[in-house]
């Protein structure tokens, strides 16, 4: 049961967290480039 529950929770979580981190790092790079 845990094997079925874990991926069910991890997939959407990673699918939301990973793009959020990517967008955050991208926006930080853009801000640094604009300031410099």
Curated annotation (Swiss-Prot):
State its location(s): Plastid, Chloroplast thylakoid membrane
In which broad location class does this protein mainly occur, judging by the first location in its UniProt entry?
plastid
Q: Which residues cross the membrane?
A: 6-26
InterPro entries from the UniProt entry:
PSI_PsaI, PSI_PsaI_sf
Q: Which GO terms describe its biological process?
A: photosynthesis
Q: Name one GO cellular component term.
A: photosystem I
Q: How does it sit in the membrane?
A: Single-pass membrane protein
A Pfam family per the record: PSI_8
Q: Which UniProt keywords apply?
A: Chloroplast, Membrane, Photosynthesis, Photosystem I, Plastid, Thylakoid, Transmembrane, Transmembrane helix
Q: Which family does it belong to?
A: Belongs to the PsaI family.
Which PANTHER family does the entry mention?
Answer: PHOTOSYSTEM I REACTION CENTER SUBUNIT VIII (PTHR35775:SF2), PTHR35775
Could you tell me what this protein does?
A: May help in the organization of the PsaL subunit.
Q: What is this protein called?
A: Photosystem I reaction center subunit VIII
